[in-house]
Every structure is written in C-alpha cells, then in structure tokens.
From Swiss-Prot:
Subcellular location: Nucleus
Domain of life, source organism: Eukaryota
GO biological process: chromatin remodeling; regulation of DNA-templated transcription
Lineage: Eukaryota, Metazoa, Chordata, Craniata, Vertebrata
Protein name: GATA zinc finger domain-containing protein 1
GN (gene name): Gatad1
Keyword Nucleus: yes
Amino acid sequence: MPLGLKPTCSMCKTTSSSMWKKSPQGEILCHHCTGRGGGGAGVAGGTGGGGGGGGGFGTTTFATTSAGPSQSNGGGGGKQSKQEIHRRSARLRNTKYKSAPAAEKKVSTKGKGRRHIFKLKNPIKAPESVSTIVTAESIFYKGVYYQIGDVVSVIDEQDGKPYYAQIRGFIQDQYCEKSAALTWLIPTLASPRDQFDPASYIIGPEEDLPRKMEYLEFVCHAPSEYFKSRSSPFPTVPTRPEKGYIWTHVGPTPAITIKETVANHL
C-alpha cells in the first residue's frame, strides 16, 4: 500500500483500526471485520438466497455485520442472521480420578521430646567479632619473662644485621597474639659491633606500629640509670656503704662465701 493513503475497510467502510489485513480475494479488512470469518462470502450467499424468492432461509449464514442495515433483494425477506459466534473454552475436568482427601493430622498426647528442649523458637544470630586489645606491663612468651624496658634485637631482612630496641609496652589481641611497642636505640662510635653495650647507646625515635613477639629476640633486662650501671650485680668488695638497694640474681646465693670474703677484706 502506498505511503500517505489511508486504508478503508471494504465491509464497514471504516478508516481507523488497530490492525489491517488483506483477505484472499484482495480486499482490505479492518481488525473487527477480520474476525467474522468469511464476511464477503456470507454477504453474497445471503443476496442469492433472497433473490430465490419466497423468503427462504436455505442459505443462512452466521456472519455478523458491525454497521449498516441487512441487504435484501427481490420480494422476499431473506434476512441475515445476526447471531454472533462466541467461542468459549471449557475446561475439561476428569472427575473419574479424584484426589484423595488429606489425612487428618494426629494429635500426639505424649509429652515433648528431649530435642524440643534445645530448640529455640526465635534463633538469634551470633554477633560479629570485634577486635579487642589488652595492654600489659609484662608478658610471658616462649619461656622468657618480658617487662617494660627490656632490650630486644630485631634482624633486618636486607642486610641481616641486628638492630636493638627497648620495649615500651605490650599488646595482646583477641586471638592471644602478643606484640610489643618499641623504642629504637641508636648506636654511637663507642658501640661494639659484635655485642650490645647499654652504656654506648642512646634512646632514639619511638615506633608507632607494634611488632609481633616472634620477630623479637631477648637481649637483656632494663639497665639501671639510663643504660649505665653504677654498681656491679656480682658480689664484690663494697667501697662504700650501700643502703636501701640490694642486688640479687636468679638461683641459689652463696651467702656464707660472700660474708667470709667481705670479712677478710675488712
């Protein structure tokens, strides 16, 4: 069909339709006239039946017309029936096999079982784990008792040299993983290379992030008086009386030997 020309239904002469179709005879039909089922043939059959005279209904058609009066030729009364065909779909139900009725639920007269005691009616979701940190002044790790102020060494991965630091505090998380906050010790020109001398190191910067205890190696406990011991921890002849302070060490103390040595020197 050329563009710009409005189609016209050959039966109802309408110019507006949601869908247009073409009949096998080449006639243009609208969507309403398409569902009639052989509209053009029905009109022709009705005309021939009316011309036969006498008002016979020999060729009665069940096609419906949407608009316009019924056509009749001759002196008869050949009228087209205006009965509409409605196709109704009926459900086919097989009544031979009916579903069995649901069995009645038996009510138990016994008491509740043991499993019912442990079943919660309203289960509660476990809360998410929150990381908690516990600080301490001393910990026990791999057979060594660490305290604040102890000196530890850390091996560098690149050069493999030990670097010394002093423990500033201890941290333990929820999984019992122990860490320590360190304060680095800076060596001087008088510091030996093969061992640690507390008198030759000075306090350096403090490290913000803690380090795990598995990377730390114990060196010594906190030296007295800022890395310089004024008196020896071993039993020697005292040069002056020391009051209010006693040196001690782990293990049995030979008290008799110390007293005899001091008495002989006096």
